[in-house]
Amino acid sequence: MTPTPGEADLTNTPAPRARRSVLSRGSWSETARIAGILRKETVGGAVLLVASAVALVWANSPWAESYFALRDLKIGAEPFGLHLNLTLGTWAADGLLAVFFLVVGLELKREFVAGDLRDPARAALPMAAAVGGMVVPALIFVAVTAPVGDGATRGWAIPTATDIAFAVAVLAVISTHLPAALRTFLLTLAVVDDLLAVTVIAVFYTDEINLTALGLSIVPLALFALCVQRRIRSWWLLLPLGVATWVLVHESGVHATVAGVLLGFTVPVLRSVAAGGPEAGPGLAEHFEHRLRPLSAGVAVPVFAFFAAGVAIGGVSGLTRALSDPITLGIILGLVVGKPVGIFLTTRVLTAVTRANLDDALRWIDVFGVALLAGIGFTVSLLIGDLAYGLGSDRDDFVKVGVLTGSLVAALIAAVLLRVRNRHYRAVWLQETADTDRDGVPDVYQSQRD
């Protein structure tokens, strides 16, 4: 039928394209993997909190001198001129945290090769949000501390980190059923945060570089890579190569935790064709991650926190002095205001620019609640504080007060926001876990089963 004048011909008009949803539910395999990681991190977070509390109580008790004497006790030697006669606090920061960053390297590579970050469309949002969550708190810290001078701005990266173990411990305490999409977003944010943190540590907190030691570190690193590419799992071979890499990176002047990330990056994520291909089971990276994550979350990070979190507050007057210092204020404002605002605004702007919609199961208040959880910066924040101002210095003490206070305030506000929404989260959780045919895959994931 020919349309009359003034009438639009709708027969050939294309249907409007549906808008893409952001923070939508991912695949079942990825959701299940992330749930397993967060369960382990919850236990690690509890141990982390206990270790930090013990350190704080001990450092402010009549036996405080014994705590600081233990932290500053030197153990080691200097064979072949290598500087390995370190304090226990330094061994924890440089040595044990290398295990933590090894797991970070494994996780990063898996995310980029087989996880959500392999898809540019899904990776763009958390990566941009992580950058926003780094830039805004850094700017706030610099604005607050710049008038002080005397190198106060050197700690600009302190309020930019996220402690996933601390964050999921908060979720466990408030018993919230966070939807899978938000859990994935939080973990991916933390993973990208760790990548940015390693880059910042290597670039901005390295004063002098011993090029000879750095060049020599390539030899054991390459041998380690050769072994894992050939799927050699023998720890009697891999461990000495890993330790040798760590020693030489430490000697080079680059922070030794970078060695952990580099070692993690060498481990293959997918099985080779000769080993049966991806369908034959998880790759070596996932195998190592399962083995090392309990050591990282349950031992390495809590021991570091024990030696790093102890600060002699000095009563009410000392706490007042610390809280009024620009470094402390810059960290608190960076974590509580800068971090969530940076993540939230970046997410909101990117969603608007790409003409996408937030997933139907979520509201923007949910995104802000997760952004507040990302404001819990602990492990990496304390490490950067040590690097920026020196372990045991007055400014390092202000860093500890700022990180502890800022993380606590961010956790409390996030807990209130997320707890208010918990009834809705529970309804989403029931939908995401319903498995009427009892085949092990929840019904909502049946169409994307992989």
Swiss-Prot record:
It catalyses: Na(+)(in) + 2 H(+)(out) = Na(+)(out) + 2 H(+)(in). GO terms for cellular component: plasma membrane. Gene3D superfamilies: Na+/H+ antiporter like domain (1.20.1530.10). The chain crosses the membrane at residues 43-63, 86-106, 124-144, 155-175, 185-205, 208-228, 234-254, 258-278, 299-319, 326-346, 364-384, 398-418. GO terms for molecular function: sodium:proton antiporter activity. One of its GO terms (biological process) is regulation of pH. It is a multi-pass membrane protein. It is found in: Cell membrane. InterPro entries: Na/H_antiporter_dom_sf, NhaA. Keywords: Antiport, Cell membrane, Ion transport, Membrane, Sodium, Sodium transport, Transmembrane, Transmembrane helix, Transport. HAMAP family: NhaA (MF_01844). PANTHER family: NA(+)_H(+) ANTIPORTER NHAA, SODIUM ION/PROTON ANTIPORTER NHAA-RELATED. Na(+)/H(+) antiporter that extrudes sodium in exchange for external protons. Belongs to the NhaA Na(+)/H(+) (TC 2.A.33) antiporter family. This is Na(+)/H(+) antiporter NhaA 2. The gene is nhaA2.
